[in-house]
Amino acid sequence: NLSVGTIVEHVRFGKGNITKIEGVGADTKAEINFANGGLKKLLLRFAKLKVLD
């Protein structure tokens, strides 16, 4: 389950930290600060994020 502070990995942007989650259901977006890609807002249903421990 994704929440603020969760560390995730994205195929294109690499590792990042979730800084904000907004929206409901299919429109849920996460703002993620990626080490290599900067700050991005992604729709979770398309993002294909892998949660890292």
Residue spans of the language-model regions?
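A short macromolecule-binding patch
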Residues: K29-K48
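Short acidic/glycine-enriched loop/turn segments that link adjacent beta-strands
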Residues: G25-A26
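Mixed-charge, Lys/Arg-rich low-complexity intrinsically disordered regions
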Residues: N1-I7
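Short coil-to-beta-strand transition motifs
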Residues: I7-K15
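Core RecA-like ATPase module of SF1/SF2 helicases and allied nucleic-acid translocases
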Residues: V51-L52
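Short beta-strand-centered aromatic/proline hotspots
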Residues: G14-E22
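Charged, alpha-helix-enriched surfaces in structured cytosolic catalytic cores
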Residues: S3, F13, G37
